[in-house]
Structures are given as structure tokens and as C-alpha cells.
């Protein structure tokens, strides 16, 4: 079975074509600047050079048409006919309380996704546009929605309810939802496989640390708490997001700086985090370079703040689960940042591990980076959200065939 996985952002489209018979990625790529001038498609077929194609893409439909064109192209394509695509798996950011698992898409599902637009105004409209465009271009091909929020729907009510008047939850569904669910689910399952133990008996803290960052407590295979909340702005300090701060800072800044609420939230989303503290960049590599090689104090402070909040969260989740068997690092910084991993883990040894500094040098590869005799295993597991989306899609489509 060949499955096309799509991840539509507001002006971008990431895709992978996977052959599920042998779990191979046949091709992958990225369409950028959709609806803006200078649109660009970067495409790479397995075993071939990367190809860059500049062509105007006014909307997601035109981008998807171009993607399908290159997939069947004689020179750079990997399939002879569009009909070889058995199903399409769509990443959807917010499924609200409607979806606890991936679903086959029909009109009813689309209606519910539209109901969730208020909860994810930046992401859901693009996700829906991508789904509708695919339905038009590929009628009859099964489509599946895989949600960032679904994995966290197993959280108990005391973990997701905010201590504000309960009527706001009833009226507006204000609660913790959590994100990066597909990634947390994949790395927790993979950790159990590597450890050779059933996930149903493990307590795992998964750390998805990239430009967006979140940590999840996975107990017996289920998410019981996660650091992102009603939106992806809560929790850890991130590339440009503040993470959790005192809410009254919003009104204080509005008064002192003459800003609207919308402007303050924009600052908290786009100008804060390690970028806000360092004043350099939202890229951890730039900040680490400034901190370690140039002695930049604010860059070092940004790294320390990021590591400190992550450290506290790992400790809190070990407490919430009544212990921990494994701590897993994934995503850009988690997979490729030995220094940051060491920063975060320093002082957490009381949980039952010793970091092996030699093994911790690993970048972008699966590894156990704690010492052999550590009771708690510390692991690096590169995330593979596309594979997870394809797996869920395959499972649902096989169910209807």
C-alpha cells in the first residue's frame, strides 16, 4: 500500500510518499511560500538528487497538483500513475474533544474540524484546505485525519481542567489539549520496543524539543499529562514562544506599552522564548555558538532558562507518574543537542540514572545515553511523525477494504 502523507501549514506543504509493504520513503518534499510570490517546491525522490522547482502556487490546491505532477514525472517521479496512491494521511493540528484517535474523513469530520477553527486559528484552516483540495483532485481516494491532540485525550480531568470558573470549560471548551501527540506517541512506543518491555508497564517522560517544545508523561502507554495547554503557547520556553508566564503580565504590558491583547499574544508567540531572551535567534545552534564560543551572557541565560524549565517539568512528571523508567529526547534539539541534553539532565540523577557523556555525543540516531547500570534509561529517538500518520492511515483504510 502506497500512502501520501500531507502536512499543510498556512503557507507551506510538507509531504512524503511511503510504501507500507517495506516501510520505505519513496519521495519527500516541501512546498513553500504558497499564496506568496516566489513559491518554491523542493522535491527528493529516494536515491536521487534534490530538485528545486520555482512555480507560482496561489493556494494549497495548486501546490498539491504540483506535488502529484512531480511524483508521476518520468525523470524525478517515483510512480507511473496517480492511481498508485492508495490513501492520503493528513496531519491535523486540533481535533478538540471530538477525536480521541485518527479517523477516516467524511463530511461530518470536516464539519467538526471547522468547529475547532477557534481553537487553532493558524493551523486548522490550512489543514482543512489541504483536505478539501485533495478530495477534489483525488476523488474516491480514502483520506485519513491524524490529530496532534488525539494522543492526549487520555488525560484525566484533573490534569486538563484549568482552575478558572468551570462554566468557561462548558461554554468555550477551555481546557488543556496538548500537542505534538503523534510524536510523543511514536517515541514512547519505540522506546518500549528498544527496551524490550510492554509499554503497558512503563512510565516514560517524552521530551519533544524543537522550535516548538513539549514534554509528556506517558504512563502504561497513555498520555496522562503534557506541558502544552489550550494552545501550543503554554509550557516550556521555546524558540519564539514564552511558554508559561504569569497571565497578568499580558494586561500589565498592554497598559505600560500601549498594546492590544492581540499584540501582546503575538509577542508571546513570535518574539519571546530563547529568541526573546538572547536577542539573537530562535535557532538553538546560533544561540549555543554565541554562548559557548563568543561568551554571550544573554545567549547563555536563554539556554539556562530553557533547560531549567524542561528539568522542572521532567521532575514534575516523574512525580505525577509515581516514578519513571525512561526519559526520551526527540525533535531538532532533543535529537541533535548533546549540550542541551546534558544541561537538562544535570541534577536529575536522583531519579535513577547516570548520563554516559561519551554516548551522549550522539546526534540524530537512536541510542541509550545513560550508563549500562542505570535503572532509568535515558534515550535519544528521532521522531517520525510521517511514518506514524502513514501507519494510522494504513490501519483505517485496511479496515474498510
UniProtKB/Swiss-Prot annotation:
What is a GO molecular function of this protein? magnesium ion binding
Give a Gene Ontology cellular component term annotated to this protein.
cytoplasm
Q: Where is the active site?
A: 148
**What is an example of a Pfam family matching this protein?**
Acetate_kinase
User: What does the record give as the function of this protein?
Assistant: Catalyzes the formation of acetyl phosphate from acetate and ATP. Can also catalyze the reverse reaction.
* UniProt xrefs under HAMAP family: Acetate_kinase
Output this protein's name: Acetate kinase
Q: Which organism is it from?
A: Caldanaerobacter subterraneus subsp. tengcongensis (strain DSM 15242 / JCM 11007 / NBRC 100824 / MB4) (Thermoanaerobacter tengcongensis)
